Amino acid sequence: MLKVLPIQSKETQESICRSAGIEYRPDALAYAASVDEELVGICQFKLTSEGGILYDIATVKDHCVNKECSDFEALFVMGRGTLNFIDLCGVHRAFYQGESPDDRLLRAIGFRPNEKGIYEINLEGFFTDHCHEHS
C-alpha cells in the first residue's frame, strides 16, 4: 500500500535526505512516501509569499537493489499531495526549484516550464475544477 505522510521530526527528515542523496533543508516542510512500509521517496517544500516552492521530489537510493520496481507513481502521488497541502494553505501558485528536474514527472504532476524555464503551476481550481484544462 502506498502512503504519503508528513515527516514529523527534523532528525528523520535529515536522515531521509541523506538516504536520497539530497541537501537537507532544515527550514523546509517534508513528506515521505512509502510502499508496503518501505521508504521510497521524500519531497521537501516551503510556503513563501511568492508561492509554494518544491525543492526535491527524490527517490531514496538503493531501495530497489534486488528487485524491479518503479517509483514514478509514488513520487507522483507525493508531488500531488504536496501541491494539495500548499493549495489548502491558501497558496495558489507553486514552483519547482530542485537541482535536477525530472521533466516527465513534473509535467505529470501538473508543472509546466514558464517563460524563464522554471517549472510552475497555478493551483487556482486545480483540485476542484475537474472539467478544466490546467497549464
Language model segments and positions:
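Glycine-rich loops and low-complexity Gly/Arg-rich segments
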Residues: 28-30, 58, 67-69, 119-123
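Acyl-donor binding region in acyl/amide transferases
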Residues: 52-115
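Terminal substrate-recognition subdomain of acyl/acetyltransferases
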Residues: 32-46, 95-135
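A conserved beta-strand-loop-helix scaffold within acyl/acetyltransferase catalytic domains
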Residues: 19-61
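Mixed-charge, polar/low-complexity N-terminal
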Residues: 12-15, 19-21, 33, 86, ...
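Short amphipathic alpha-helix that is part of the acyltransferase structural core
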Residues: 1-25, 130-135
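Short glycine-aromatic motifs
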Residues: 2, 28, 110-112
